[in-house]
Amino acid sequence: MSQQGTGWTAPGAIQRKAILDRSKSIAIVGASSNPSRASNFVLTYLSSSLCDFDLYPVNPRETEILGHTCYPSLADLPVVPDVVDVFRRADDCPAIAEEAVAVGAQTLWLQLGIVSDEAARIASSAGLDVVMDRCTKIEHARFAGGLHLAGFNTGVISSRRA
């Protein structure tokens, strides 16, 4: 799917899987210590034994989330993240895209419900892969076999009687 005027084309499932397969480090911009926030749920999943990522929460108001040191900005990270996973409003994304380019990230990933044509233009024109309106947790689980046609494979919900 091409977004007219941005030069951005949405990567298909094969490309998204390749992005996750080659990535070793993920910076989670907008990470929260609040367990009811989506960013906390995704960080919890990505911290699990199912995943093998080095995780770097980014939030200037936090110092540690789920045992991970939290950093005030992408520039403060001790490594160059492969993926910059964004949990912020679409209006904030162009500035985050510029930061991702400046630190040398490979991928700008905007979470489910977040679309920013300007951020996509900034990142893609600098050679970054761009994923928008997709959840890293859902995509990883999907490719790792944790999702099925009926949804999440939790083993809890069933129509069968015990």
Which role does the model predict for each range below?
Residues 1-59, 66:
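Hydrophobic, well-ordered beta-alpha structural blocks that scaffold small-molecule cofactor pockets
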Residues 7-12, 65-94:
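Glycine-rich, highly charged phosphate/nucleotide-binding loops
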Residues 50-53, 103-106, 126-128:
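A short helix->loop->beta-strand "cap" motif at the edges of active sites that frequently abuts
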Residues 65-67, 81-82, 118-121, 139-145:
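Short, charged, surface-exposed secondary-structure boundary motifs
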Residues 112-139:
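Rossmann-fold NAD(P)-binding glycine/threonine-rich loop
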Residues 139-162:
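A charged, well-structured terminal subsegment
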